[in-house]
């Protein structure tokens, strides 16, 4: 389905520079777009690609359009440009692109008919809204509540007493254990597990060394998981239930694939967590934080609002102040890394040599005096 720029602006705002009747039927990168496609410029370092793109129209920020016009003597198509170009001018082209992309997906995806697949297992004591879509081999246990417009894809498991908020979509093989609350419009991707037991074991050992006897005693995890509205949880991510109170994921948190969130954590609203990050139990992360991929955060620490942890960093203490924090060693040439590692191994010896030199110099200074 093709839409004019005028129709897009009526839906999403912005201003048109060029032909308002230009039609686009999809999106593509600047260097690959054709005349029927909409591209976007989110990073000014790619401004030169706007000059050569074949896109029918480009989403662009006002300041970047000014730079472009300055580079092309104010003309809509300068000497280096592929042809006349149309623009939708908006303060945030990237977010505008995301909304248009979702619109095209929605237009191209026929709505699924509500109902329960014959192979699904729904406990008689569960409540399932008539507008919900329940796919093949889904299990919904007693006391669970499936609200309006929820989609549960194949093999989804919903435990007893759990609530899935209106408009949520759970992809195949996602599992939400008992006693959890999923807010409205959640997206939970394939293989995610919400509400599995937290990692809690009490040591019960006596003796030392080879004479040590006893075992680890499992601590029942009687809390649940509360997920706020508009949260997205990536594939194969696990969020443990609380030991006594709930683990809490606040509104509009976005969690990537294969992230581990331990029991009793609280993740503040609008925080984003990239893939393979691990957050140990009883940690609190503030609002609008950004956690890089494969970062590790120790248990019982607090991160303040607007904290950014870069990829592969390890956090072992609380960071209450907003800012960017790094502890990862960046990739360097292999030989250079080996030389640096050798220096690190010898730091103790180097320190002792420096101390000895300082002592000798001090003694020499005393003799000269």
Curated annotation (Swiss-Prot):
This is UDP-3-O-acylglucosamine N-acyltransferase. Keywords: Acyltransferase, Lipid A biosynthesis, Lipid biosynthesis, Lipid metabolism, Repeat, Transferase. It comes from Burkholderia ambifaria (strain MC40-6). Belongs to the transferase hexapeptide repeat family. LpxD subfamily. Catalyzes the N-acylation of UDP-3-O-acylglucosamine using 3-hydroxyacyl-ACP as the acyl donor. Is involved in the biosynthesis of lipid A, a phosphorylated glycolipid that anchors the lipopolysaccharide to the outer membrane of the cell. Its EC number is 2.3.1.191. The gene is lpxD. The active site is at 263 (proton acceptor). Coiled coil: none annotated. One of its GO terms (molecular function) is N-acyltransferase activity.
